Amino acid sequence: MYEEILYYELIKLGYRADRQLLLPIEYEELHIKDAYKVDLLIEGMLVLELKSVHPLPLVYFNQIRTHLSLLNLKHGMLLNFKVELMKDGIYRVFNNFGKESL
C-alpha cells in the first residue's frame, strides 16, 4: 500500500519512477534475469526500499546496498513505516559508505 501511494504521488509531481524494478545478475554462464527487486527507483538515481517492520533488521540495509551496487548508484533511502514519527523511520544508505539516519 505505501509503495503504491508513494509511486502515485511521485508520478503526480512529475518525477520519473520505476516500481518493482527487476535486477538481473550474471555468474559465469548463468544469467538470472529477476534475481533482485527494487521497490522504487526515482529518476534513475535514487533507490527507495519501503518496509513496515519493528525492529528493523540490518539485513535490509545490506539489501539496499546490493541494489545500489547492481545499479552502480551511490545513494538510496530505506523508509520504515512502522514508527511513531516518520522522521525516525527514514535512513539514507550509501553504497560502501555506511548508513545514516536523517
What is each PLM-predicted segment?
Residues A17, V38-L56, H67:
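Conserved catalytic cores of phosphodiester-cleaving nucleases, focusing on short active-site segments
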